[in-house]
Amino acid sequence: MEQRKHRRYRFHCEIWFPGKQVSVTGTASDLSVIGCKVESKKRVYIGKCLALQICLPGQEATLKVDQAAVRWAKGQEYGLEFLTIGSEEEERLRRFLSTLEAG
């Protein structure tokens, strides 16, 4: 069984992929400090890099991930690894995940 380096938190939240022509939404789950699982109608392929915004519950501002890479894909589900995220955004994510851990 694979052991992960970073704990994943199982909950669902809305995500948004801003685009030049059209923006696409989806649902994120299994969130960690380095990535998440996504379900969306947005077509992707392994290795594709994209920007996204995550609507974290209880927070007014979306969490912006400047660049994430698709690491696996199966149908409308795929795994993203966060490659570029601002230091303030990363700290917001860490604080949010620590509140989930505290229960």
Give the ranges of each region predicted by the language model:
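Structured alpha-helical
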Residues: M1-G103
